[in-house]
């Protein structure tokens, strides 16, 4: 029972990081229709930045906060390159984000090398259902809940959120009523970058990161977002938590070597189910 509880709770913690990464993808896609394949790079860049800031004597909390702000700034710059030029299409934006992701690889290797890095998180542990759980996992869960609830309130209850929602629903109509669609797109990239950066900052104390860690994050985040068709944050959260728990169970009872395959199989199953449902609707 103790092992099962440990796998479930740690899986929820890691799943929250996947949900944050996937939520960043959803925000960007809903507003710009661009699939941002540099999303994982935001997470890695911010996590590695924290290691440098802490080594320079910047205190915990401030270092993580500055790194998340950096993620937002890098996200906005990514958006400027991907969609800033008039006439760009979602397809060209996707290609740009792929290229920027490769550039991020090179920068991260140049600045931090290719060895995995980590930094200390919230210390201590608690006993839950007979399992000793690192307190940092509870921090990940709590921060994710607060951030995603805040994001939902932003979209539902503020003028800025309504402008983002209007742009996502119909960019042409948004322009007609005076909404700056490009500004909303850049803001979406900034929010996506901050969410990705937050995911990296939260997960690094329990999972080391290196320049290529973005692959696992973006695969799992994209798999979570696929459950919600890249447009539904609640299903993205559910997908991230499901992936985190299943991967923790697979890693605990079988082997950690199969964890990435879990995300790929999940994505494949969702796509097949969606295609089958579409065929049934068309036949009817």
Per-range role (PLM):
Residues 25, 58-100, 107, 239-243:
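Alpha-helical transmembrane segments within multi-pass membrane transporters and channels
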Residues 3-55, 78-88, 92, 227-234:
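Single transmembrane alpha-helix segments in multi-pass membrane proteins
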Residues 24, 88, 111, 169-183, ...:
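Cytosolic-side transmembrane-helix boundaries in multi-pass membrane proteins
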Residues 18, 22, 59-69, 189-196, ...:
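Transmembrane alpha-helical segments in multi-pass inner-membrane proteins
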Residues 1-21, 49, 58-63, 89-94, ...:
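Membrane-interfacial amphipathic/re-entrant helices at transmembrane-helix boundaries
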Residues 85-157, 184, 254, 283-284:
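Transmembrane helix-bundle core of multi-pass membrane transporters
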Residues 10, 14-15, 132-210, 233-238:
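Helix-loop-helix "hairpin" substructures at the membrane interface of multi-pass membrane proteins
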Residues 41-42, 79, 84-109, 214-226, ...:
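Pore- or pathway-lining transmembrane helices of multi-pass membrane proteins that form conduits
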């Amino acid at each position: 029972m103790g092992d099962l509880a440990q796998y479930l709770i740690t899986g929820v913690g890691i799943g929250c990081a996947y949900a944050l990464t996937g939520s960043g993808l959803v925000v960007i896609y809903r507003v710009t229709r661009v699939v941002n394949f540099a999303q994982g790079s935001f997470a890695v860049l911010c996590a590695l930045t924290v290691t440098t800031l802490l080594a320079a004597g910047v205190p915990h909390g401030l270092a993580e906060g500055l790194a998340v702000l950096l993620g937002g700034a890098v996200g906005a710059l990514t958006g400027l390159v991907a969609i800033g030029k008039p006439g760009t299409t979602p397809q060209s934006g996707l290609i740009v984000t792929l290229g920027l992701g490769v550039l991020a690889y090179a920068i991260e290797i140049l600045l931090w090398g290719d060895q995995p890095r980590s930094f200390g998180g919230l210390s201590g542990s608690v006993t839950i259902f007979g399992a000793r759980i690192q307190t940092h996992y509870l921090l990940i869960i709590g921060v994710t809940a607060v951030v995603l609830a805040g994001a939902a309130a932003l979209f539902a209850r503020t003028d800025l959120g309504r402008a983002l929602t209007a742009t996502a629903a119909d960019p042409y109509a948004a322009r007609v009523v005076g909404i700056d669609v490009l500004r909303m797109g850049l803001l979406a990239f900034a929010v996506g970058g901050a969410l990705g950066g937050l995911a990296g900052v939260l997960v690094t104390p329990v999972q080391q990161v290196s320049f290529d860690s973005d692959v696992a994050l973006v695969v799992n985040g994209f798999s979570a977002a696929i459950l919600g068709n890249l447009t539904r944050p609640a299903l993205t959260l559910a997908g991230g938590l499901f992936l985190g728990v299943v991967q923790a169970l697979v890693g605990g009872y079988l082997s950690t070597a199969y964890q990435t395959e879990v995300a790929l199989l999940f994505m494949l199953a969702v796509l097949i189910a969606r295609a089958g449902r579409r065929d049934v609707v068309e036949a009817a």
